[in-house]
Amino acid sequence: MLQPSRRKFRKEQKGRNTGVATRGANVSFGEFGLKATERGRLTARQIEAARRAISRHIKRGGRIFIRIFPDKPISQKPAEVRMGNGKGNPEYYVAEIQPGKVLYELNGVPEDLAREAFTLAAAKLPLRTTFVTRMFGT
């Protein structure tokens, strides 16, 4: 699973996920992409589950590009622990997703196969997504 190798600080504040994606909004590595149309967060497990769904469907053909990385730690307190006594320990990592962000890209596969693979991957994700193709000149 994806997670940062080391961080300057172990814990991070909650923050707010606002705005739309301006960086990472175009298909730039592959021919086809899976783009988020909704705001949310993806855990490292969800990113990996979708990647596995894509790679199983395209078998040996093509190349997958993961355009997101879970770099935000989410802390949790253990079950049945009283309030107070500080913040919980980091349990997992998430990637904050804005609308318009390209999540995955595929190269070297036909369009119909890419569509099917991205449909399977989208079922593993908690966000609404859309299929996009590369605009030449970008």
From Swiss-Prot:
Family matches, as SUPFAM superfamilies: Ribosomal protein L16p/L10e
Source organism of the structure: Leptothrix cholodnii (strain ATCC 51168 / LMG 8142 / SP-6)
Biological role: Binds 23S rRNA and is also seen to make contacts with the A and possibly P site tRNAs.
Membrane-spanning intervals of the chain: none
Domain of life: Bacteria
Record-linked InterPro entries: Ribosomal_uL16, Ribosomal_uL16_bact-type, Ribosomal_uL16_dom, Ribosomal_uL16_sf
One GO molecular-function entry: structural constituent of ribosome
Keyword tRNA-binding set for record: yes
Gene (name only): rplP
Bias-annotated ranges (Basic residues): 1-13
Official protein name in the record: Large ribosomal subunit protein uL16
Family: Belongs to the universal ribosomal protein uL16 family.
Keyword tRNA-binding (UniProt): yes
